[in-house]
Design a protein with these regions (language model features):
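Residue-level marker of regulatory loop/turn positions in helix-turn-helix DNA-binding domains and
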Residues: 109, 130, 161
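Conserved phosphate-coupling serine/threonine residues in phosphotransfer and NTP-handling enzymes
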Residues: 12, 131-133
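Generic enzyme active-site microenvironment
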Residues: 6-8, 130, 186
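Short, flexible loop segments at the rims of nucleotide/cofactor-binding pockets, characterized by
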Residues: 103-107, 132, 202
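Asp-based, Mg2+/Mn2+-dependent phosphohydrolase catalytic module
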Residues: 1-3, 29, 64, 121, ...
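Extended, well-ordered alpha-helical scaffold segments
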Residues: 87-91, 133, 149
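N-terminal helical cap/lid subdomain that shapes the substrate entry/recognition surface
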Residues: 2-115, 123, 139
Length: 237
């Protein structure tokens, strides 16, 4: 049994797609860009933070192939994606305050997640959230949706490298005071799998989030679960 479980947020414990989609469309519209994206495509924008999400949205606007979006924001980033950092930052200044003010409108926990957190606490397992979502939104959502459920939560902030770099997880482990070999990282994307591996931890991938079971299996990831009960069994076995 693991002594600590570290969770991603978007697509793992919370279905945030509705609010993320609204915020992307608002920011793009306000800055004169293409908007009206649906949740299916927005799911592929996110996973590596706001900057990469906006870069992917702008690349789609410029007819970048949707099936190559996951390469943007990685070391294998294509040369033909959107590259104007000044424009990305301009849109980000609209997106961030709007999302922080509207991050809890449509968002809610996935089935069984609240019960899972209680069962883990009852077993004495420490829990934490490490997300590339802006830290202000992470703290708001943890407080509103999971009061008292987590021992630690951390989102994207200045001065610490975002996932898949291990820095955020390392900070979490420092606070939890649990050896990394006794912790597991849980997420729904290729970024989460890389984060866990880069942090020297086992990884459990969930298939109810922003990436499909088939996509996760193609990486291939270490272990895939399809519901909260399966996840509990993997954490406590």
């Amino acid at each position: 049994m693991y002594k600590a479980a570290i969770f991603d947020m978007d697509g793992t414990i919370l279905n945030t797609l509705g609010d993320l989609t609204d915020a992307i469309n608002y920011a793009m519209k306000e800055t004169g860009h293409k908007y009206g994206y649906n949740e299916k495509i927005v799911a592929h924008f996110f996973g590596s933070g706001v900057y990469v999400a906006l870069k992917r949205a702008l690349s789609v606007e410029n007819r970048f192939p949707e099936d190559r979006l996951d390469l943007i924001g990685t070391p294998d980033e294509p040369d033909d994606c959107f590259k104007d950092d000044t424009e990305i930052e301009r849109i980000s200044k609209i997106y961030r305050p709007y999302y922080n003010a509207h991050c809890d409108v449509k968002t809610g926990p996935y089935p069984g997640i609240l019960e899972l957190m209680k069962k883990l606490r009852d077993r004495g397992i420490k829990t934490a959230v490490v997300s590339n979502k802006p830290d202000a939104a992470v703290q708001t959502l943890v407080s509103d949706k999971f009061p008292g459920a987590f021992n630690f939560s951390l989102g994207e902030k200045t001065g610490i490298k975002r996932k898949p770099a291990p820095d955020m997880v390392n900070e979490c482990l420092r606070v939890l005071e649990i050896p990394r070999g006794e912790c597991v990282y849980i997420g729904d994307s290729e970024v989460d799998f890389a984060t866990g591996r880069n942090s020297g931890m086992h990884v459990i991938s969930v298939d109810w989030g922003f990436r499909s079971h088939e996509y996760l299996a193609s990486i291939p990831v270490e272990k895939i679960v399809s519901n909260a009960d399966e996840l509990y069994q993997e954490i406590t076995r």
